[in-house]
């Protein structure tokens, strides 16, 4: 059995996330949460992508862990986000870095917030099938499960700027 209290796993407060019904959007929200946790684990613990996929898909997603019930997630969507961030990270990190306040490089930001912003940036740039406002809102919601409101404001500001850069047409519709 996998060890539950891995130091590289950051437990979310699922009660802070917006409750949603059992529907496709909810399964995508669960995939986003799992992707952020997986990216965090890979960043902090140095785990490889295949090992991380195997662990999350068999142990975390859709299971009860430490008294918390994790929702079933859309596995293909989870894999796309994680693999996409890993593949595009050399382009994503400078993009985020440029949008952060002077003196606050991405490397200085908490690892869980790095994971949230990387995943959101990936979706905004590469998943044009999902409305930008939905992506920003979902990742702000994921951030709420881990950090205080001040920090979610930073996530919102950075992802909103990325959305307007890559999806300007969605914001000019009124």
Curated annotation (Swiss-Prot):
Keyword set includes RNA-binding: yes
A Pfam family matched in the record: NusB
BP terms from Gene Ontology: DNA-templated transcription termination; transcription antitermination
Record keyword RNA-binding present: yes
Keyword vocabulary terms for this entry: RNA-binding, Transcription, Transcription antitermination, Transcription regulation
GO MF annotations, alphabetized: RNA binding
Origin superkingdom: Bacteria
Any one cellular-component term (Gene Ontology): cytosol
Functional description taken from the UniProt entry: Involved in transcription antitermination. Required for transcription of ribosomal RNA (rRNA) genes. Binds specifically to the boxA antiterminator sequence of the ribosomal RNA (rrn) operons.
HAMAP family reported in the protein's UniProt record: NusB
Protein family according to the UniProt entry: Belongs to the NusB family.
Descriptive protein name: Transcription antitermination protein NusB
Organism from which the protein derives: Rhodopseudomonas palustris (strain TIE-1)
